[in-house]
Every structure is written in structure tokens, then in C-alpha cells.
Amino acid sequence: MSDQYVISRRSALGVIGAGSAAAALAACSTSNSNGGGGSDSSKRDDYSGEVKLEKFDTSAGNYEPATREHPAKNVPKPIKPDNLNDKSVEGFYQNIAFLVAGMQYISMTADGSALKESNIKNKEQVSTLEEQMKSSGAPDKSWSEDFTVKASLDTPQPKIEGDNYTWEGKLSINLGSFMVRDGQAIDIPEKSRHQEMPYTFTGTYKDGTWEIDLKPKTSASSGASGGASTGSGSGGGFGF
């Protein structure tokens, strides 16, 4: 694989990891009116399993998966949840869902607008990430067949300590069977197509909004599911 292409993917994931977008880069709608008030309330008892965002903007047209000839077309854009700033387990969950969906969107389109609407820590670095990805050829000259980012949660509910919420989970990445770099298709070895790593999702609620931070659990084995690595520095990233 092209080093420049791989670095841009790693950097994209580094933005999510630990709020340390700067470290990753060095390695290469309205809110609900209930806002911050009141006690925590959940819409359901069990949030464990895959994190899913419910709403996407599909107005660009029918989605067309990537081929060896062209990148994915009309990629659905994540829609910011109305309750993104609610102080609740549901609000925290929706922040994780929107952030991860935004991460996939920027990885497929080099458009960070969804991430800029999220409450990710250090999101001022997203513009730099966009520039870096575009300089590497994304999305018109560099893409992968089936790039997906998914998060899952290990427990039904997060740990809550005052305004600080913590959820243990996993982040998984799928690249598909090939990537394209400068118009040239390159097969991806099967062992490198899917990677999964334990992550800690944290949220701090302050002044009516969340600050979301995602950190890889660097103490875990780096060989999980295809040789994922933790990257270097605070917050690491997702190595390929």
C-alpha cells in the first residue's frame, strides 16, 4: 500500500482516538431544548452491542459502492441528532454514534463537515485532516472498496461519575478487498482487511454540551483481528 494513503487513514482514526488529532496528524442542527437540565434518563436499559446512528441525508441520490474504477458515490451523510446535547445516557450514546458515522463519512469523502458538527475533543483539527486526506488523493484518486467504521459497547450502561461518563467498547475497521491509489487498484491481503481494537469512550458534560473522547486501550494485545496497532503518542490511532 502507498504510505501516504495509509497515513491518511491512520490519521483519520487518530482524530477519534483520545482527542489527540494533533498527534495523529504529526504521524503523517439544533440541540434539544432540554440541554443540560435535570437528572439522567435513558431511553432504554441495554445499549450494548453495535452503535447505530438512525438518520442520514440521502438527498444526493442512490448510493453506489466503490469499484476498482470509481470511489463510492452519493455517500449518505450523517444527520446530527436533535438530542446531541442532552445530559443523559441516550445523549452520550448519540454522540458516539454521530461521531463514528462522521468518521466513516470523512474517510469516504474527505468531507469533515459532520465531524465538525460533533462534540469530539480537539475538533479544530478536522480541517487539517481534510487537507491532508485531499493531498493524498482522497476521495477521487484514493479509496478502498468497502471502508466502514463501527463501534460497539461492551456493557448495557456506561459508568457515570457526576458529569463524567465512561463506556468500554470496541472500534472496528473494514477496508474491503482492494484499495485504489492514483488510479491503480491494489489488492488488500485478507488478514489486513478487518481490524478491531478495544476502545474507551468518554464523555464530559460541561456548560450544556458534551466533550467526547475516544481512546484505544493500549494495554490490549495489538494482534487483535488482523494485526491492529495502537499507534504512538497519547491517544494513538488505528494502525494499518
Predicted regions and their residues:
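Core segments of small alpha/beta cavity-forming domains
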Residues: T67-E145
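Secretory targeting signals
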Residues: M1-I7, G19-A23
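N-terminal short leaders/motifs
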Residues: Y105-G112, S152-N164, G169
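Exposed beta-sheet edge and beta->alpha loop/turn motif
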Residues: G19, G37-E54, K159-F240
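A short, amphipathic edge element
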Residues: A138-P158
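Juxtamembrane and targeting peptides
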Residues: I16, A21-L25, S29-G91
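N-terminal export leaders
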Residues: R9-L13
